[in-house]
C-alpha cells in the first residue's frame, strides 16, 4: 500500500477571512504543504503579516483587502485569477442574541455573510476551477467552514445555527453536482476555538467552565487543529471524501 502524503505543490488555494484566527492558520498550513495562496480579508495590514509568513515557505501569495459580501468585487477578484484548485470558505461571524431579541439587521447581516456570500464564493471558485482543462484528473476541493453548532443546538445562537446548518445542506448538494468533475466538497465543524472572535466570550469564567464541561477531551480547539483538518481535505489524502463533515469538536456532538 502506498500512503498518500500531503503535498499541495502546483496547487493554488483561496482562503477567505485569512487575516486572523482560523483563516490565517489555514492559509499558513496550506503554504507549508506547498500550495500557493490567494488570501482575502477586510484589513490589508493583517493580510500583509500573513503574506510575509506564507512567503517564508517559498509559496506565492496574493492578497486582497475586501468585504466578501461585495459580490461584484469578489467576482472580479476570482475572475482575474489564473487558476484556483482549493477554496477555504472561512469568512463568517456570530452575533449572540436570544431568539426573541434577535435584531433584524443582525440576522440579515449574518445570513448575508455566513451563507449567501459563502454560496457566491463557492460558485465563482467552482466556475474558475472548471476552466482548467484537466480538472477531472487533478481534482479540486471546496472546504466550507461550518461549526459544531450546525449539528447541535445552543443558547443565544439561533441565527448562527441556522446559517451554519445551511452550509451543511449546500455542501451536500454541491458534492453531488460536482462529483463528475472530481471536485470534492466538505465542511469542517469546529467546537469553540481560541481566536480573536471567541476571546471575549471566554473571558466569562462561568461560560468558559460550562463550555469546557461539554467537551469530553477537556480543552478548547486550537486553530492548528482546524487547519490540520482543512489541509487534509485539500489534499489527495482525502480523495474519496466528499459531501460530509469533519467535526473538530473534541467529542461535543457525541454526548
Question: What annotation goes with each model-predicted range?
Answer:
Residues 127, 176-180, 239:
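Alpha-helical segment proximal to the catalytic Tyr-Lys
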Residues 2, 183, 219-248, 253-254:
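C-terminal substrate-recognition "lid" of short-chain dehydrogenase/reductases
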Residues 12, 19-21:
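Conserved glycine-rich cofactor-binding loop
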Residues 122, 163, 171:
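Active-site helix of classical SDR
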Residues 98-99, 103-111, 211:
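Substrate-binding pocket helix/loop in short-chain dehydrogenase/reductase
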Residues 147:
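Residue(s) in the substrate-gating loop at a strand-loop-helix junction
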Residues 45, 64-76, 104, 225:
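The beta1-alpha1 cofactor-binding region of Rossmann-like NAD(H)/NADP(H)-dependent oxidoreductases
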Amino acid at each position: 500500500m502506498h500512503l498518500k502524503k500531503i503535498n499541495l505543490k502546483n496547487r493554488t488555494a483561496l482562503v477567505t477571512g485569512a487575516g486572523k484566527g482560523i483563516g490565517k492558520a489555514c492559509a499558513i498550513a496550506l503554504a507549508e504543504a506547498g500550495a500557493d495562496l490567494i488570501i482575502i480579508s477586510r484589513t490589508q495590514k493583517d493580510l500583509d503579516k500573513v503574506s510575509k509568513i506564507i512567503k517564508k515557505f517559498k509559496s506565492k501569495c496574493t492578497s486582497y483587502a475586501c468585504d466578501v459580501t461585495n459580490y461584484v468585487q469578489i467576482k472580479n477578484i476570482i475572475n482575474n485569477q489564473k487558476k484556483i484548485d482549493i477554496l477555504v470558505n472561512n469568512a463568517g461571524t456570530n452575533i449572540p442574541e436570544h431568539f426573541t431579541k434577535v435584531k433584524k439587521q443582525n440576522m440579515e447581516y449574518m445570513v448575508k455573510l455566513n451563507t449567501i456570500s459563502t454560496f457566491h464564493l463557492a460558485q465563482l471558485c467552482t466556475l474558475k476551477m472548471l476552466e482548467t482543462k484537466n480538472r477531472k484528473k487533478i481534482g479540486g476541493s471546496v472546504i466550507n467552514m461550518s461549526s459544531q453548532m450546525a449539528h447541535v443546538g445552543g443558547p443565544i445562537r439561533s441565527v448562527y445555527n441556522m446559517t451554519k446548518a445551511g452550509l451543511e445542506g449546500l455542501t451536500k448538494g454541491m458534492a453531488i453536482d460536482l462529483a463528475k468533475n472530481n471536485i470534492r466538497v466538505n465542511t469542517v465543524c469546529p467546537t469553540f476555538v481560541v481566536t480573536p472572535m471567541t476571546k471575549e466570550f471566554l473571558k466569562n469564567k462561568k461560560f468558559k467552565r460550562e463550555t469546557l464541561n461539554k467537551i469530553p477531551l477537556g480543552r478548547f480547539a486550537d486553530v492548528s487543529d482546524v487547519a490540520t483538518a482543512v489541509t487534509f481535505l485539500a489534499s489527495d489524502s482525502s480523495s474519496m471524501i466528499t459531501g460530509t463533515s469533519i467535526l473538530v469538536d473534541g467529542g461535543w456532538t457525541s454526548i
